[in-house]
Curated annotation (Swiss-Prot):
Marked site: Reactive bond: 381-382
Gene that this polypeptide is encoded by: Serpina3c
Glycosylation, residue list: 38, 104, 184, 269, 390
One BP term from GO: response to cytokine
Stored Gene3D superfamilies: Alpha-1-antitrypsin, domain 1, Antithrombin, subunit I, domain 2
Signal sequence, renumbered to the chain: 1-22
InterPro entries from the UniProt entry: Serpin_dom, Serpin_fam, Serpin_sf, Serpin_sf_1, Serpin_sf_2
Name of the featured protein: Serine protease inhibitor A3C
Alphabetized UniProt keyword annotations: Glycoprotein, Protease inhibitor, Secreted, Serine protease inhibitor, Signal
Organism annotation: Mus musculus (Mouse)
Length: 417
Protein backbone atom coordinates (compact mmCIF):
# COMPACT_ATOMS: atom_id res chain seq x y z
CA UNK A 1 0.00 0.00 0.00
CA UNK A 2 1.48 3.33 -1.03
CA UNK A 3 0.54 6.94 -0.50
CA UNK A 4 2.65 9.54 -2.27
CA UNK A 5 2.13 13.28 -1.95
CA UNK A 6 3.93 16.33 -3.29
CA UNK A 7 3.17 20.00 -2.92
CA UNK A 8 4.66 22.84 -4.90
CA UNK A 9 4.55 26.50 -3.92
CA UNK A 10 5.76 29.15 -6.37
CA UNK A 11 6.89 32.56 -5.10
CA UNK A 12 7.23 35.42 -7.56
CA UNK A 13 8.39 39.01 -7.34
CA UNK A 14 5.90 41.88 -7.42
CA UNK A 15 8.59 44.22 -8.71
CA UNK A 16 12.24 43.84 -9.76
CA UNK A 17 15.12 44.79 -7.54
CA UNK A 18 15.67 42.00 -5.03
CA UNK A 19 18.35 40.28 -7.05
CA UNK A 20 22.05 39.79 -6.22
CA UNK A 21 23.50 36.44 -5.30
CA UNK A 22 26.93 35.12 -6.27
CA UNK A 23 27.08 32.14 -8.60
CA UNK A 24 24.61 30.22 -10.72
CA UNK A 25 25.76 26.69 -10.18
CA UNK A 26 23.39 24.11 -8.76
CA UNK A 27 24.06 23.78 -5.06
CA UNK A 28 22.59 21.37 -2.54
CA UNK A 29 22.67 22.37 1.09
CA UNK A 30 21.21 19.92 3.60
CA UNK A 31 20.98 20.07 7.33
CA UNK A 32 19.03 17.57 9.41
CA UNK A 33 17.77 18.83 12.72
CA UNK A 34 18.82 16.61 15.63
CA UNK A 35 16.01 17.24 18.10
CA UNK A 36 16.85 16.45 21.68
CA UNK A 37 14.35 14.30 23.49
CA UNK A 38 13.67 17.06 26.01
CA UNK A 39 10.48 17.83 24.17
CA UNK A 40 8.80 21.11 23.31
CA UNK A 41 6.15 23.22 24.96
CA UNK A 42 3.78 22.26 22.13
CA UNK A 43 3.49 18.56 22.91
CA UNK A 44 2.89 16.06 20.12
CA UNK A 45 -0.69 15.26 21.14
CA UNK A 46 -1.71 18.92 21.07
CA UNK A 47 -0.03 19.43 17.70
CA UNK A 48 -1.70 16.27 16.38
CA UNK A 49 -5.12 17.57 17.43
CA UNK A 50 -4.50 20.98 15.83
CA UNK A 51 -3.26 19.36 12.62
CA UNK A 52 -6.32 17.09 12.54
CA UNK A 53 -8.59 20.12 13.01
CA UNK A 54 -6.93 21.78 10.02
CA UNK A 55 -7.10 18.52 8.06
CA UNK A 56 -10.85 18.17 8.45
CA UNK A 57 -11.47 21.88 7.77
CA UNK A 58 -9.55 21.52 4.52
CA UNK A 59 -11.29 18.22 3.70
CA UNK A 60 -14.71 19.87 3.98
CA UNK A 61 -13.67 22.61 1.54
CA UNK A 62 -12.28 20.05 -0.92
CA UNK A 63 -15.44 17.93 -0.64
CA UNK A 64 -17.61 20.97 -1.29
CA UNK A 65 -15.63 21.97 -4.37
CA UNK A 66 -15.22 18.40 -5.64
CA UNK A 67 -18.56 16.63 -5.07
CA UNK A 68 -18.85 12.98 -6.05
CA UNK A 69 -15.15 12.70 -6.88
CA UNK A 70 -12.22 10.94 -5.25
CA UNK A 71 -10.36 13.03 -2.67
CA UNK A 72 -6.80 12.26 -1.62
CA UNK A 73 -4.44 14.61 0.21
CA UNK A 74 -1.87 14.88 2.97
CA UNK A 75 -2.77 17.59 5.49
CA UNK A 76 0.69 17.25 7.04
CA UNK A 77 2.41 18.06 3.74
CA UNK A 78 0.26 21.15 3.27
CA UNK A 79 0.59 22.43 6.83
CA UNK A 80 4.37 21.86 6.85
CA UNK A 81 4.78 23.83 3.62
CA UNK A 82 2.69 26.69 4.96
CA UNK A 83 4.61 26.64 8.23
CA UNK A 84 7.87 27.03 6.29
CA UNK A 85 6.43 30.05 4.47
CA UNK A 86 5.34 31.49 7.82
CA UNK A 87 9.01 31.52 8.89
CA UNK A 88 9.43 34.40 6.46
CA UNK A 89 6.04 36.03 6.99
CA UNK A 90 5.34 39.06 9.17
CA UNK A 91 2.40 41.02 10.50
CA UNK A 92 -1.06 40.06 9.31
CA UNK A 93 0.34 37.65 6.72
CA UNK A 94 1.96 35.63 9.50
CA UNK A 95 -1.18 35.65 11.63
CA UNK A 96 -3.34 34.53 8.71
CA UNK A 97 -1.15 31.53 7.98
CA UNK A 98 -0.85 30.27 11.55
CA UNK A 99 -4.48 30.97 12.46
CA UNK A 100 -5.53 29.34 9.17
CA UNK A 101 -3.64 26.27 10.36
CA UNK A 102 -5.86 26.44 13.48
CA UNK A 103 -3.21 27.66 15.93
CA UNK A 104 -4.28 30.00 18.72
CA UNK A 105 -1.47 32.55 18.83
CA UNK A 106 -2.51 33.86 22.24
CA UNK A 107 -1.97 30.38 23.70
CA UNK A 108 0.94 29.11 21.62
CA UNK A 109 3.99 31.26 20.75
CA UNK A 110 5.16 31.11 17.14
CA UNK A 111 8.52 29.63 18.17
CA UNK A 112 6.76 26.72 19.89
CA UNK A 113 4.76 25.99 16.73
CA UNK A 114 7.92 25.63 14.66
CA UNK A 115 9.66 23.58 17.34
CA UNK A 116 6.60 21.33 17.46
CA UNK A 117 6.67 20.78 13.70
CA UNK A 118 10.41 20.19 13.79
CA UNK A 119 10.04 17.60 16.54
CA UNK A 120 7.21 15.86 14.68
CA UNK A 121 9.02 15.73 11.33
CA UNK A 122 12.21 14.55 13.00
CA UNK A 123 10.34 11.64 14.62
CA UNK A 124 8.67 10.74 11.33
CA UNK A 125 12.05 10.70 9.61
CA UNK A 126 13.29 7.83 11.78
CA UNK A 127 13.48 4.83 9.47
CA UNK A 128 11.16 1.98 10.41
CA UNK A 129 11.66 -1.66 9.69
CA UNK A 130 8.06 -2.26 8.64
CA UNK A 131 6.60 1.12 7.58
CA UNK A 132 8.48 3.34 5.15
CA UNK A 133 7.84 7.07 5.56
CA UNK A 134 9.90 9.65 3.75
CA UNK A 135 9.12 13.34 4.16
CA UNK A 136 11.05 16.45 3.26
CA UNK A 137 11.09 19.93 1.77
CA UNK A 138 13.24 21.72 -0.76
CA UNK A 139 13.73 25.37 -1.69
CA UNK A 140 14.63 26.19 -5.29
CA UNK A 141 15.95 29.75 -5.29
CA UNK A 142 16.65 32.07 -8.23
CA UNK A 143 20.42 32.03 -8.63
CA UNK A 144 20.73 35.81 -8.09
CA UNK A 145 18.27 36.08 -5.19
CA UNK A 146 19.62 36.93 -1.75
CA UNK A 147 17.81 34.84 0.88
CA UNK A 148 18.14 35.96 4.49
CA UNK A 149 20.42 33.63 6.41
CA UNK A 150 18.00 33.40 9.36
CA UNK A 151 15.16 32.12 7.15
CA UNK A 152 17.36 29.58 5.41
CA UNK A 153 18.87 28.31 8.67
CA UNK A 154 15.47 27.89 10.34
CA UNK A 155 14.08 26.11 7.29
CA UNK A 156 17.03 23.73 7.45
CA UNK A 157 17.06 23.14 11.18
CA UNK A 158 13.33 22.87 11.84
CA UNK A 159 11.96 21.48 8.57
CA UNK A 160 14.94 19.55 7.22
CA UNK A 161 14.70 21.67 4.07
CA UNK A 162 17.23 21.27 1.29
CA UNK A 163 18.31 24.34 -0.68
CA UNK A 164 19.08 24.52 -4.40
CA UNK A 165 19.81 27.35 -6.80
CA UNK A 166 17.95 27.48 -10.11
CA UNK A 167 17.89 29.73 -13.15
CA UNK A 168 14.26 30.84 -13.52
CA UNK A 169 15.25 32.95 -16.52
CA UNK A 170 15.23 29.54 -18.23
CA UNK A 171 11.73 28.39 -17.12
CA UNK A 172 11.75 25.05 -18.95
CA UNK A 173 15.09 24.01 -17.47
CA UNK A 174 14.04 25.14 -13.98
CA UNK A 175 10.75 23.26 -14.28
CA UNK A 176 12.58 20.07 -15.26
CA UNK A 177 15.03 20.47 -12.37
CA UNK A 178 12.20 20.75 -9.84
CA UNK A 179 9.99 18.03 -11.30
CA UNK A 180 12.90 15.60 -11.57
CA UNK A 181 13.70 16.20 -7.90
CA UNK A 182 10.11 15.53 -6.82
CA UNK A 183 9.88 12.46 -9.03
CA UNK A 184 13.06 11.00 -7.51
CA UNK A 185 11.93 11.70 -3.94
CA UNK A 186 8.53 10.04 -4.51
CA UNK A 187 9.79 6.84 -6.15
CA UNK A 188 8.78 8.32 -9.54
CA UNK A 189 5.11 8.22 -8.57
CA UNK A 190 4.55 11.98 -8.93
CA UNK A 191 5.60 13.60 -12.17
CA UNK A 192 5.00 17.07 -13.51
CA UNK A 193 4.20 18.70 -10.16
CA UNK A 194 5.16 22.18 -11.34
CA UNK A 195 4.16 23.82 -14.61
CA UNK A 196 3.75 27.29 -16.07
CA UNK A 197 6.82 28.82 -14.44
CA UNK A 198 7.81 32.18 -15.85
CA UNK A 199 10.75 34.55 -15.58
CA UNK A 200 9.13 36.38 -12.64
CA UNK A 201 9.55 33.28 -10.48
CA UNK A 202 12.01 33.82 -7.64
CA UNK A 203 11.55 30.75 -5.45
CA UNK A 204 9.75 27.40 -5.50
CA UNK A 205 9.09 25.46 -2.31
CA UNK A 206 8.21 21.77 -2.59
CA UNK A 207 7.15 19.39 0.15
CA UNK A 208 6.70 15.66 -0.28
CA UNK A 209 5.62 12.62 1.71
CA UNK A 210 6.09 9.02 0.62
CA UNK A 211 4.41 6.29 2.65
CA UNK A 212 4.56 2.56 2.07
CA UNK A 213 3.05 0.10 4.51
CA UNK A 214 2.31 -3.60 4.55
CA UNK A 215 -0.91 -4.88 6.07
CA UNK A 216 -0.43 -6.68 9.35
CA UNK A 217 -2.95 -9.17 7.98
CA UNK A 218 -2.62 -9.09 4.18
CA UNK A 219 -5.31 -10.05 1.69
CA UNK A 220 -4.71 -13.13 -0.43
CA UNK A 221 -4.44 -12.10 -4.12
CA UNK A 222 -6.05 -15.42 -5.09
CA UNK A 223 -9.23 -14.31 -3.31
CA UNK A 224 -9.54 -11.03 -5.26
CA UNK A 225 -12.49 -11.06 -7.67
CA UNK A 226 -14.58 -8.73 -9.83
CA UNK A 227 -17.52 -7.20 -7.97
CA UNK A 228 -19.89 -4.24 -8.03
CA UNK A 229 -18.96 -0.89 -6.50
CA UNK A 230 -22.01 1.37 -6.27
CA UNK A 231 -21.44 4.96 -7.39
CA UNK A 232 -25.01 5.84 -6.38
CA UNK A 233 -28.38 4.10 -6.20
CA UNK A 234 -28.57 3.80 -9.99
CA UNK A 235 -24.98 3.31 -11.18
CA UNK A 236 -22.24 0.83 -10.42
CA UNK A 237 -18.89 -0.25 -11.83
CA UNK A 238 -16.99 -3.52 -11.72
CA UNK A 239 -13.85 -3.33 -9.59
CA UNK A 240 -11.27 -5.81 -8.25
CA UNK A 241 -12.61 -6.62 -4.78
CA UNK A 242 -10.18 -7.93 -2.18
CA UNK A 243 -11.46 -10.38 0.38
CA UNK A 244 -10.26 -11.57 3.75
CA UNK A 245 -11.95 -14.28 5.79
CA UNK A 246 -12.25 -14.80 9.51
CA UNK A 247 -10.27 -11.92 10.90
CA UNK A 248 -10.38 -10.18 14.25
CA UNK A 249 -9.91 -6.45 13.88
CA UNK A 250 -10.78 -3.22 15.77
CA UNK A 251 -14.39 -2.32 14.97
CA UNK A 252 -16.96 0.28 16.02
CA UNK A 253 -20.54 0.82 14.98
CA UNK A 254 -21.38 4.54 15.38
CA UNK A 255 -25.17 4.65 15.67
CA UNK A 256 -25.18 8.41 16.24
CA UNK A 257 -23.50 9.11 12.88
CA UNK A 258 -24.87 6.02 11.10
CA UNK A 259 -21.53 4.63 10.03
CA UNK A 260 -19.26 1.65 10.60
CA UNK A 261 -15.59 2.12 11.45
CA UNK A 262 -12.92 -0.56 10.98
CA UNK A 263 -9.20 -0.26 11.68
CA UNK A 264 -6.74 -2.21 9.56
CA UNK A 265 -3.24 -2.09 10.96
CA UNK A 266 0.05 -2.01 9.12
CA UNK A 267 3.14 -3.78 10.29
CA UNK A 268 4.96 -1.22 12.39
CA UNK A 269 3.65 2.13 13.59
CA UNK A 270 0.79 3.06 11.25
CA UNK A 271 -2.86 2.18 10.80
CA UNK A 272 -5.77 2.99 8.51
CA UNK A 273 -9.31 3.77 9.59
CA UNK A 274 -11.98 2.87 7.06
CA UNK A 275 -15.28 4.67 7.62
CA UNK A 276 -18.35 3.31 5.81
CA UNK A 277 -21.42 5.56 6.17
CA UNK A 278 -24.84 3.99 5.80
CA UNK A 279 -26.46 4.61 2.44
CA UNK A 280 -27.27 8.32 2.09
CA UNK A 281 -25.39 9.32 5.25
CA UNK A 282 -22.04 10.47 3.82
CA UNK A 283 -22.83 14.19 4.15
CA UNK A 284 -23.85 13.70 7.77
CA UNK A 285 -20.55 11.97 8.53
CA UNK A 286 -18.53 14.59 6.62
CA UNK A 287 -20.21 17.44 8.51
CA UNK A 288 -19.24 15.78 11.81
CA UNK A 289 -15.55 15.36 10.98
CA UNK A 290 -13.45 16.97 13.70
CA UNK A 291 -10.69 15.87 16.09
CA UNK A 292 -13.25 14.82 18.71
CA UNK A 293 -14.97 12.54 16.20
CA UNK A 294 -11.71 10.86 15.29
CA UNK A 295 -10.84 10.42 18.97
CA UNK A 296 -14.26 8.94 19.67
CA UNK A 297 -13.87 6.42 16.86
CA UNK A 298 -10.38 5.39 17.94
CA UNK A 299 -11.30 5.16 21.62
CA UNK A 300 -14.44 3.15 20.85
CA UNK A 301 -12.77 0.52 18.68
CA UNK A 302 -13.00 -2.99 20.09
CA UNK A 303 -11.69 -6.27 18.66
CA UNK A 304 -14.44 -7.87 16.59
CA UNK A 305 -14.37 -11.25 14.92
CA UNK A 306 -15.59 -10.85 11.37
CA UNK A 307 -16.69 -13.48 8.92
CA UNK A 308 -15.53 -11.61 5.83
CA UNK A 309 -14.29 -8.15 4.91
CA UNK A 310 -14.37 -6.87 1.33
CA UNK A 311 -12.32 -3.86 0.20
CA UNK A 312 -11.74 -2.61 -3.37
CA UNK A 313 -8.25 -2.67 -4.83
CA UNK A 314 -7.52 0.69 -6.39
CA UNK A 315 -5.01 3.32 -7.45
CA UNK A 316 -6.20 6.93 -7.59
CA UNK A 317 -4.51 10.30 -7.93
CA UNK A 318 -5.62 13.88 -7.42
CA UNK A 319 -4.23 17.37 -7.77
CA UNK A 320 -5.49 20.62 -6.28
CA UNK A 321 -4.75 24.29 -6.72
CA UNK A 322 -4.72 25.39 -3.08
CA UNK A 323 -4.63 29.02 -4.14
CA UNK A 324 -8.36 28.63 -4.78
CA UNK A 325 -9.10 26.88 -1.47
CA UNK A 326 -6.90 28.28 1.32
CA UNK A 327 -8.45 31.79 1.20
CA UNK A 328 -11.68 30.17 2.40
CA UNK A 329 -9.75 29.07 5.51
CA UNK A 330 -8.52 32.62 6.06
CA UNK A 331 -5.13 32.31 4.34
CA UNK A 332 -5.41 35.09 1.76
CA UNK A 333 -2.61 37.64 1.91
CA UNK A 334 0.21 35.37 0.73
CA UNK A 335 -1.51 35.29 -2.68
CA UNK A 336 -1.95 39.08 -2.90
CA UNK A 337 0.11 42.25 -3.17
CA UNK A 338 -0.56 42.81 0.54
CA UNK A 339 1.69 39.84 1.36
CA UNK A 340 4.52 40.54 3.78
CA UNK A 341 7.12 37.83 3.22
CA UNK A 342 9.97 40.18 4.04
CA UNK A 343 11.47 37.61 6.41
CA UNK A 344 12.59 35.68 3.32
CA UNK A 345 14.48 38.39 1.44
CA UNK A 346 14.24 41.49 3.63
CA UNK A 347 11.87 43.27 1.24
CA UNK A 348 8.09 43.20 0.72
CA UNK A 349 8.04 42.20 -2.92
CA UNK A 350 7.20 38.50 -2.88
CA UNK A 351 3.85 36.77 -3.29
CA UNK A 352 2.82 33.14 -3.64
CA UNK A 353 1.63 32.74 -7.24
CA UNK A 354 1.01 28.97 -7.25
CA UNK A 355 0.35 26.32 -4.62
CA UNK A 356 -0.26 22.89 -6.09
CA UNK A 357 -0.85 19.65 -4.19
CA UNK A 358 -0.68 16.22 -5.85
CA UNK A 359 -1.37 12.87 -4.23
CA UNK A 360 -1.37 9.22 -5.32
CA UNK A 361 -2.95 6.41 -3.31
CA UNK A 362 -2.49 2.71 -4.11
CA UNK A 363 -4.35 0.09 -2.07
CA UNK A 364 -3.63 -3.55 -2.83
CA UNK A 365 -3.56 -6.98 -1.21
CA UNK A 366 -0.18 -6.60 0.47
CA UNK A 367 -0.72 -3.07 1.73
CA UNK A 368 -0.79 0.64 0.90
CA UNK A 369 1.62 2.71 -1.12
CA UNK A 370 1.19 6.47 -1.14
CA UNK A 371 3.11 7.99 -2.56
CA UNK A 372 -20.59 7.52 0.21
CA UNK A 373 -32.10 3.44 -0.38
CA UNK A 374 -33.91 2.86 -3.13
CA UNK A 375 -33.66 0.36 -5.93
CA UNK A 376 -30.28 -1.22 -5.11
CA UNK A 377 -29.59 -4.15 -2.85
CA UNK A 378 -26.52 -2.91 -1.00
CA UNK A 379 -24.70 -5.60 0.95
CA UNK A 380 -24.24 -4.25 4.46
CA UNK A 381 -23.18 -5.50 7.86
CA UNK A 382 -25.17 -8.60 8.73
CA UNK A 383 -25.57 -10.79 11.76
CA UNK A 384 -22.58 -12.83 10.74
CA UNK A 385 -20.52 -9.63 10.51
CA UNK A 386 -19.55 -9.48 6.88
CA UNK A 387 -18.61 -5.97 5.78
CA UNK A 388 -18.56 -4.73 2.19
CA UNK A 389 -16.82 -1.48 1.26
CA UNK A 390 -18.77 -1.43 -1.98
CA UNK A 391 -19.91 2.20 -1.92
CA UNK A 392 -18.35 5.57 -1.09
CA UNK A 393 -16.16 5.42 2.01
CA UNK A 394 -13.52 7.42 3.86
CA UNK A 395 -9.97 6.44 4.76
CA UNK A 396 -7.68 8.05 7.35
CA UNK A 397 -4.05 6.92 7.65
CA UNK A 398 -2.31 7.78 10.92
CA UNK A 399 1.12 7.37 12.44
CA UNK A 400 0.39 5.64 15.73
CA UNK A 401 3.53 6.73 17.61
CA UNK A 402 2.90 10.46 17.19
CA UNK A 403 -0.87 10.09 16.63
CA UNK A 404 -0.70 12.30 13.55
CA UNK A 405 -3.04 12.16 10.56
CA UNK A 406 -0.81 11.59 7.55
CA UNK A 407 -3.41 11.19 4.79
CA UNK A 408 -7.15 11.49 4.23
CA UNK A 409 -9.04 9.98 1.31
CA UNK A 410 -12.60 9.68 0.08
CA UNK A 411 -13.15 6.88 -2.40
CA UNK A 412 -16.15 7.46 -4.64
CA UNK A 413 -14.92 5.70 -7.80
CA UNK A 414 -12.09 3.14 -7.37
CA UNK A 415 -11.53 2.85 -11.13
CA UNK A 416 -11.15 6.57 -11.79
CA UNK A 417 -7.43 7.35 -11.71
Amino acid sequence: MAFIVALGLVITGICPGVLCFPDGTLERDTLFHKDKENGTQLDSLTLASINTDFAFSLYKKLALKNPDTNIVFSPLSISAALAIVSLGAKGNTLEEILEGLNFNLTETPEADIHQGFGHLLQRLSHPGEQVQISTGSALFVEKHLQILAEFQEKARALYQAEAFTADFQQPLEATKLINDYVSNQTQRKIKGLISDLDTDTLMVLVNYIYFKGKWKMPFNPRDTFESEFYLDVKRSVKVPMMKIKTLTTPYFRDEELSCTVVELKYKGNASALFILPDQGRMQQVEASLQPETLRKWKNSLRPRKMGELYLPKFSISTDYSLKNILPELGIKEIFSKQADLSGITGTKDLIVSQMVHKAVLDVAETGTEGVAATGVNFRILSRRTSLWFNRTFLMVISHTDVQTTLFIAKITHPKRA
